[in-house]
A protein has these predicted regions:
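N-terminal glycine-rich flavin-associated loop
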Residues: 1-7, 33-36
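A generic, well-ordered mixed alpha/beta core segment in the N-terminal half of proteins
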Residues: 4-17
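Residue-level signal for inorganic ion chemistry
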Residues: 5, 88, 116
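A short, Trp-centered hydrophobic/proline-enriched beta-strand micro-motif
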Residues: 19-27, 71
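Short glycine/proline-enriched turns and hinge-like loops at secondary-structure junctions
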Residues: 35-37, 48, 61-66, 80-84, ...
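A structural signal for short hydrophobic beta-strand segments in well-ordered beta-sheet cores
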Residues: 41-44
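A short core secondary-structure module
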Residues: 53-100
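Glycine-rich beta->alpha junctions and the first turn(s) of the following alpha-helix
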Residues: 97-170
Length: 170
């Protein structure tokens, strides 16, 4: 909502509101660990828009997603690894995208590697401003990681603490 174009919002918001669309977030890359600024997967300008290559790893529910919010390197900015990153709205049915499940110890497949091989996106798939992806994703992650789902995930611990304190005489 904050960074998407009016066209992008009109395209996806009705499906989000109706619970019909599933999204995944493609940021982490193989061999990068937790260093998001080290991502290398390129998005190169083409006559028709953007050409994506590379891979994302630990992408939750990519195998079920309709779309990905993907972070790619659109340019190299000397002395600023956070510069030159851009976000894209990616239809997961686009040719050239392969989703490989990562099986966890109990045998579940929640996480995935997503491989991009000459994936062609139109110009209007760029979210926000080219090269401003770092600021966009940090703003989005700050919201995501401080919203109701964050503190509500601790509700059982808080309720147990209230019960424990209520049971004490003083």
């Amino acid at each position: 909502l904050s960074f998407g174009s009016a066209e992008q919002c009109h395209k996806i918001l009705p499906g989000i509101a109706q619970g019909e669309l599933v999204f995944c977030i493609g940021m982490s890359e193989p061999d990068s660990g937790s260093d998001l600024a080290s991502l290398r997967s390129p998005a190169k300008r083409s006559d028709d828009g953007w050409l994506l290559n590379g891979a994302k790893i630990w992408t939750t529910n990519a195998h079920e997603a309709d779309y990905m919010f993907g972070l790619f390197r659109t340019s190299t900015v000397p002395d600023n690894r956070r510069g030159g990153l851009s976000q894209f709205l990616i239809d997961m049915k686009t040719p050239g995208i392969t989703v490989n499940p990562i099986v966890d110890l109990p045998g579940r497949e929640h996480f995935n590697e997503v491989v991009f091989e000459d994936v062609q996106l139109s110009h209007n798939c760029l979210i926000g401003t080219e090269g401003e992806g770092w600021d966009q994703v940090t703003a989005e992650l700050a919201y995501e990681r401080s919203g109701p789902e964050r503190y509500l995930s601790s509700i059982q611990i808080l309720l147990a603490l209230v019960d424990e304190l209520a049971a004490r005489p003083n």
